[in-house]
Amino acid sequence: MTDVSAPVFDGKAFAAQLSTAPGVYRMYAADDTLLYVGKARALRNRVGSYFNGSPKNARIMSMISQITRMDVTVTRSEAEALLLENQLIKSLSPRYNVSLRDDKTYPHVLLTREDWPRIALHRGPRAIPGRYFGPYPGVTAVRETLNLMHKLFKLRSCEDSVFRNRSRPCLQYQIGRCSAPCVELVPAPEYAESVRRAALFLEGKSDELTRELGEQMQAASEALEFEQAARLRDLISSLRSMQTRQYVDGRAADLDVLAVAMQGSQACVLLLAFRDGRNLGTRPFFPRTNGEESPEEVLAAFVSQYYIEFEPPREILLDREIPDADLLVAALSASAERKVQLKWNVRGERAGYVELASRNAQLTLATELNSRNAQHARSDALRDMLGLAEPVKRVECFDISHTLGEATVASCVVFDAAGPVRAQYRRFNISGIEPGDDYAAMRQAIDRRFRRAVEEQGVLPDVLLIDGGAGQLAQAQAALADLGVEGVLLVGVAKGVERRAGHEALVMPDGRELRPGAANPALQFIQQVRDEAHRFAITGHRGRRQKARMTSKLEDIPGIGPRRRASLLKHFGGLVGLKAAGEAEIAKVEGINDALAARIYANLHGLATPDAAE
């Protein structure tokens, strides 16, 4: 049915008043939904091509019929337009664009920037000062790299709270994987040199590092510093041994291999990564498509979106030629500030890598489709068991986690017919209730989640699972009734008498109990969702509990607000380090004077509190 209230968009008139400069255009529907983002070498020509009456496929015709307004951004070059286009696609996910969907956080190796740097696996925002190397295809590749770093350069991996409170070396020192900077068994300049060498290695400059170490070994030998020369000799030997084991092909150097497989509207792009000649493994991606894009278009969209966020290697092998390859090369090279090559139809060893990536892409897509089909079957079984007329498009589940009422956290996880939608997970820190009151915690969490949905006209689930029995279900019912939320089917998931998986009872709003049995695919789906909610709640609770225990003793000290509390914990690496410090050491922290340091020390050690003011 046509929406007669929607304004008519005159695409021809809009295009006619555009310039012929390069740029990016955006198409919007009547409700301001972003339909599509595109780039243009000449905006007037490209935008006008949508409205010139020439034949177009069904997807394009459907999109054009929904346009009520457009806007454009002029850029200095087509390469700049390409970068902007893909930044917008990645951040806004327009309905009709191929979009790289990946709700996982890419793992990196982090080398911190501090007096005694540590090396560690890192996920998430780059909030910690330091250098980030990656991304790596998976955690296994990062751990293998860290293992090499500890063996070769003996850098610390411990958290600051542990590092600052060691009185003797730990096991890592005893097994030769750390030089014990915590107790300064290694001089600061020597440790800094190890950090510099590790950075060279992580940058892919192991050949340069080996040559440099050889020169240092020769110099030490000529200076009759034979112990130092022997240490350098052993390090060179370890590096060469590692290279012999790890290098698949010395010519591979820094290289990404990309292959795409498609079946219907489902696509898989597989990344095979080499860094410094080492095979770091594979990582699959499943871009959102509309079913009418070619594999070449999907691969081109992936290349532009992925390498806008992450630094590209010098060479990227593709399993097929892609559109706008020259433009992509120019944009990626400009972004990386060095030459980046895209290659296809390669020979020799590189052809073998492409074949390997292609085969893995096909196998991974087949596995993913089987998994999604099984997930869809479980979702359909849930619909049938609950007697719903329509397919279940969205399921949410709430769970509560706490330790004897401490640090209560509620979780909300979201599933659709294809599986978890992790980007829409939410946690709620529960406050203002009697500790341990799970009913009040559940009601507060439901109220907060759905109040916002009502105020912002957000998406509601078809089925809302509550981890608990009739009591918890009643709290959820009351919260939804207070908000006037209708059309959401509530189901309580109560553990059986023996709390065994497969013996759960499903409590319905009318008081009925369903016991589907362990083999029922609908119950298996519910268990999957419930277990994910449980995991997400526990993770949040543990983090909140740890933070509360670190800061609670400081909150009771007059004159210690959030900023000073954070400074103290950061300086000493935690409450243990702070308690071990004397008044003079505490007074060295920014914002802490002698009187306040004395008060802090007294409070932490149960002494009479000085009356001195700040």
Swiss-Prot record:
PROSITE patterns: GIY_YIG, UVR, UVRC. It is found in: Cytoplasm. GO terms for molecular function: DNA binding; excinuclease ABC activity. Keywords: Cytoplasm, DNA damage, DNA excision, DNA repair, Excision nuclease, SOS response. Its main location: cytoplasm. GO terms for cellular component: cytoplasm; excinuclease repair complex. It comes from the Bacteria. Residues 20-98 form the GIY-YIG domain. Residues 207-242 form the UVR domain. One of its GO terms (biological process) is SOS response. The UvrABC repair system catalyzes the recognition and processing of DNA lesions. UvrC both incises the 5' and 3' sides of the lesion. The N-terminal half is responsible for the 3' incision and the C-terminal half is responsible for the 5' incision. Belongs to the UvrC family. Interacts with UvrB in an incision complex. PANTHER family: UVRABC SYSTEM PROTEIN C, UVRC/OXIDOREDUCTASE. This is UvrABC system protein C. It comes from Stenotrophomonas maltophilia (strain R551-3). The gene is uvrC.
